[in-house]
């Protein structure tokens, strides 16, 4: 309420935060992504809580993404000091990367539960048109190996995916504890939907949520429009 909190609420991230709130309130994903994204009572509570937070935040939240949140917090500005949940970038917790070194930790709790965040990240993929398949496979295995993940990969500014690297004392010493101090969040996070057609929902769902989150108008209609988009993305009727 002091105005020191900043969050990323550009359209895509409001949708992913909605997934997070639904998974947290529902206590898991078993009831999610059926005929609707979530049962009505879960979805309503999720959006109401998102709006409650955003009404306490600077309107700049609706224009920024997670990297911009990190840029703001690690800069010389004096207004914002904390973000309760955001995709993590370990670079900002390393010395010398930005004006100020950030400190990352596990996400906040909602009631008795830690928020069940939506897992992000990127990976390596091999094209079906690859002309040097074995060499490419060998490189992927090399890059993803335990030793490389906690040494060369991290040294080059990479964010390792190998769990052992997240627990490695040297890696954590050089990243202000980023990996060890956020590991619980990662371990209980939920995967975003992966069905064929999902990107249609991801690309447009946040825009559907945006007006309600900014104005508080027509919660019921907002959820109806979001679920219509969801059903269309899944090829469901109605």
Can you name each region flagged by the protein language model?
Residues 1, 54, 66-82, 207, ...:
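Short helices/loops that flank or line small-molecule/ion binding pockets
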Residues 47-55, 70, 127, 136-145, ...:
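Non-transmembrane alpha-helical segments in soluble domains
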Residues 1-36, 77-80:
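Extracytoplasmic/periplasmic solute-binding protein
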Residues 19-22, 33-66, 107:
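Glycine-centered hinge/linker elements that transmit conformational signals in sensory
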Residues 94-159:
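Extracytoplasmic/periplasmic substrate-recognition and gating elements
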Residues 79-86, 103:
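Paired acidic/hydrophobic, glycine-rich loop segments that form the ligand-binding mouth/hinge
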Residues 66, 83-91, 122:
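Beta->alpha turn/N-cap motifs
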Residues 154-207, 211:
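Long, aromatic- and glycine/proline-rich binding clefts that accommodate carbohydrate-like moieties
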